[in-house]
């Protein structure tokens, strides 16, 4: 469970009414509005209150949902005293990585690539996402990992060999990934050209010299309707996943991704994968 914070809307009506309401609220601010919102079999609390210079009025802090410390605030607002950010940057990054991995696998499954051609490269310089190995190895017979810390991957690689009979190949050189059908780019290394191989990337912007796929759009209809205004989408979904136990979030695929200047769908990416053996560039 977590809490979201946003501002109450400014007074409505004519000029005189707004001035009167504003003066009255300064003398005796209205209490925060607290609403329990049910979503995806769980719930969170949405709090609307008056803020000044991005901070909640001190008189209201004592009336807020004591004991519920994890919170998200709308952009430009500071969390009230006693509350902490509901999710960490690392947790948000993990969800993004999961969505990218799920989307890559969905595209491979929808493509006409035979199983023996499903060779995938995982770029993870700092070894932050070894847990993705099992997802990848279930659908890809060959997984190459480009990392500077292969020793951290060793326990995961050993388990993949024991449970699936699949050896994991490690490299510290990006060009070694050149024969892959698709790449999962979870680092910030400068990439050489892998055209026309789709590169599913955590980066904020596409890499011009690659068939770079970034900014996945994902979601659950029920959750999309429940996101309060101003709340960061990735943080909200991470909180649903990590704090509310909505497991469906961890299995989400992107409905579209940004490729150069336009959005492309999973079927379009799958078609590119299918045609890459003939060097046909569908996503151009």
What are the roles of these predicted feature ranges?
Residues 6-18, 25-83, 105, 277-284:
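Metallocofactor- and cofactor-centric catalytic cores in central/energy metabolism, strongly enriched
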Residues 79-84, 129-131, 150-157, 190-192, ...:
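Short, charged/polar "capping" segments at the starts of alpha-helices
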Residues 88-106:
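A glycine-rich, Thr/Ser-enriched phosphate-binding loop motif common to dinucleotide/cofactor-binding enzymes
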Residues 110-175:
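Glycine-rich phosphate/diphosphate-binding loop of Rossmann-like nucleotide-binding domains
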Residues 166-226:
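Rossmann-like adenosine-cofactor binding region
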Residues 30-35, 52-56, 62, 157-178, ...:
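A short, well-structured beta->alpha microelement
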